[in-house]
Structure formats: structure tokens, C-alpha cells
């Protein structure tokens, strides 16, 4: 069974933790509930932290003279400076965080799709952007997994978020010990996961570890970390997953019956046609790794990039995009 590091996640406090929304309610969230045994959460409500209280009159972002201001229409109070100060102060205290889950469309926590109004009260929305706190998070931590709770209901987005989160947290644990042997093992165990994400960056990581320039170990880890973040900037394409599955399949070609090989090739085609999920292929490949005792493959994180308990039953049986 894989061992995982325990990531630290900043989360909007109104999601599953506290009844601190403007209307005095809490928002139940199954993803956050499922994550709780596996991560350390840092709940925060920026609006409460700047003294707005619960319940409270709503706030909104208003564009004024080309600048976004955070205001409370009912009181005409401008809380922009308070929110900016809190955001800066708070984010400076969490340098070792691994990711963020923030409330979508919130004028404080939202990272996208937050309505920006042309004026107070009944003025129409003129565009969309980030909330003040959410925008500060993206500005300071763009290299980390940052998501809104609404988007995490999408399997592809959720899987990408979880994969980045748990891989980065494990890397940080290795980085803390500054042990090259551990870094080499990390690279080896993640070979096929990294290949699925970005084969160019995967090879670049290998060259960094080879350290032909005899850089100091601190420089090696610094360069490795920067490239690792770049590797995870987008989710794998289905063509990359097909390529990785074909590489793994190559371990068994001389050991399988013709019918088994033909069946797997048919499944690869069905995956490419969006008829079956990637998990159907990985289950078969892992069963062969067990059957033929391929120890190198059994260490590959590609088969379980995050705790299996976080895979929801509703995710199974879906097509290629899942």
C-alpha cells in the first residue's frame, strides 16, 4: 500500500467548517469532507477576519476609476484596504502550504468568475474577475494547486488537483531531508505519472538529478522543484495516457496470451474513443504487474497518485474524460 504525505490546505471556512457565510449558513461539501482524514486544513473566512461579522450585509466588487474596490453597498463602507492588509498578513504566515480550496464566486475568496459591478446596489455587473483574497492567493501561490469547491465536482479537475496536491506534498517531505537517494527514488517511482503529464519536463527532471554540472544539492533541489511545478501546470492529455499505457504494456508482451494482448489493445482503442475510463486500463495493467511480480511497476504512482479512498463510486463507469 502506498504511503502518502499529509498535505496542508487553506480552505474557505464556510465550506464544511463553520456557519460564517453572509447569511449565517455553512455550505456542506463532500470533497472537503472526504479529504479530512488525509490532509491538514487551515480554515479561514477573510470577511469575518476583517470584522464584518456573521450574519452580515453582502459585499461586492465595484470598479471605480479603473480600480476594483470591495464595498458593502448597504453601509457604503469600503473595506478594500482592510481586505488587502489581511490577505498580505495571512498569506505571509502560511509559506509551507500545499494547496487551496476556496469559495467560488465570492467577492473575497473567489479566484475567477466573481462579478465586478459598475456601481453600488442596483448597478449591473460589467465583467468578472478574482476576489481580493482569492486574487492575492493566485498572485502569490500560482505554482500550487488552487481550486474552487464548485469546480472540484468535475472529476478531471478534481483528479488533477489531488494528484498535484499529494505529489507536491511528498516532494516537500523529501526536500526537507535534502537526501539525493530519496530524490532519485521519487523520480523513479513517478516516472510514468510524470510521463503522462509532460514527457519533456519528465526528462528535464532526470537531467537535473543526473547533475552533470556538479551543482550543490540545494541548487539541484531548487531546480527540480521549479521544473516539477511546471510539469503539473495542466492535466494529462488522453494521448499521453495512451502512450504511458503502451509503455507499461510493453513489460508483458512476451508473457501474455494473444487473446489477452488483443483484448488490451481493444480497450486502448475504446479509451481513445471515450467509451471507457482510464481506470479500466490501469486495473488490468496493475493486475499483470502483480501476476508477473514486476516490482518496478508496482512502485509506480501512476496507478495510485492519491489515496484510493478519495475516488468516488460515481466516478466509475464513465468515459475517457473520466
Residue ranges and their predicted role:
Residues 8-15:
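Short, hydrophobic/glycine-enriched beta-strand segments
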Residues 12, 45, 101-105:
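Short beta-strand segments
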Residues 19-20, 24-69:
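N-terminal glycine-rich anion-binding loop in soluble enzyme alpha/beta folds
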Residues 25-30, 84-90, 132:
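Short alpha-helical segments and helix-capping/turn motifs at coil-helix boundaries
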Residues 60-77, 116-127:
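A charged helix-plus-loop insertion that forms the helical arch/lid used to bind
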Residues 75-95:
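Glycine-rich anion/phosphate-binding loops
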Residues 92-174:
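Internal, conserved structured core segments that host functional sites
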Residues 144-322:
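Acidic, Ser/Pro/Thr-rich low-complexity regulatory regions
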Amino acid at each position: 500500500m502506498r504511503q502518502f504525505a499529509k498535505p496542508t490546505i487553506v480552505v474557505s471556512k464556510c465550506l464544511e467548517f463553520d456557519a460564517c457565510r453572509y447569511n449565517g449558513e455553512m455550505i456542506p461539501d463532500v470533497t472537503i469532507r472526504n479529504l479530512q482524514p488525509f490532509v491538514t486544513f487551515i480554515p479561514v473566512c477573510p470577511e469575518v477576519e476583517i470584522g464584518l461579522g456573521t450574519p452580515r450585509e453582502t459585499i461586492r466588487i465595484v470598479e471605480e476609476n479603473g480600480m476594483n474596490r470591495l464595498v458593502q453597498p448597504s453601509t457604503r463602507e469600503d473595506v478594500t484596504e482592510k481586505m488587502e492588509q489581511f490577505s498580505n498578513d495571512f498569506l505571509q504566515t502560511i509559506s509551507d502550504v500545499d494547496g487551496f480550496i476556496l469559495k467560488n464566486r465570492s467577492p473575497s475568496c473567489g479566484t475567477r468568475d466573481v462579478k465586478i459591478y459598475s456601481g453600488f446596489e442596483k448597478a449591473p455587473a460589467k465583467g468578472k474577475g478574482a476576489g481580493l483574497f482569492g486574487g492575492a492567493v493566485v498572485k502569490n501561490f500560482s505554482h500550487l494547486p488552487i481550486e474552487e469547491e464548485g469546480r472540484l465536482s468535475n472529476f478531471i479537475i478534481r483528479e488533477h488537483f489531488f494528484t498535484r496536491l499529494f505529489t507536491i506534498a511528498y516532494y516537500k517531505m523529501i526536500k526537507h531531508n535534502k537526501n539525493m537517494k530519496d530524490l532519485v527514488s521519487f523520480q523513479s517511482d513517478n516516472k510514468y505519472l510524470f510521463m503522462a503529464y509532460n514527457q519533456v519536463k519528465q526528462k528535464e527532471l532526470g537531467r537535473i538529478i543526473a547533475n552533470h554540472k556538479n551543482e550543490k544539492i540545494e541548487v539541484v533541489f531548487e531546480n527540480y522543484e521549479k521544473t516539477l511545478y511546471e510539469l503539473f501546470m495542466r492535466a494529462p492529455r488522453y494521448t499521453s495516457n495512451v502512450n504511458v499505457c503502451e509503455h507499461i504494456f510493453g513489460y508483458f508482451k512476451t508473457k501474455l496470451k494473444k487473446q489477452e494482448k488483443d483484448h488490451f489493445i481493444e480497450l486502448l482503442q475504446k479509451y481513445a474513443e471515450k467509451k471507457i475510463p482510464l481506470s479500466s486500463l490501469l486495473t488490468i495493467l496493475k493486475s499483470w504487474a502483480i501476476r508477473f511480480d514486476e516490482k518496478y511497476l508496482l512502485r509506480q504512482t501512476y496507478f495510485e497518485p492519491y489515496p484510493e479512498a478519495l475516488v468516488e463510486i460515481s466516478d466509475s463507469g464513465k468515459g475517457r474524460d473520466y
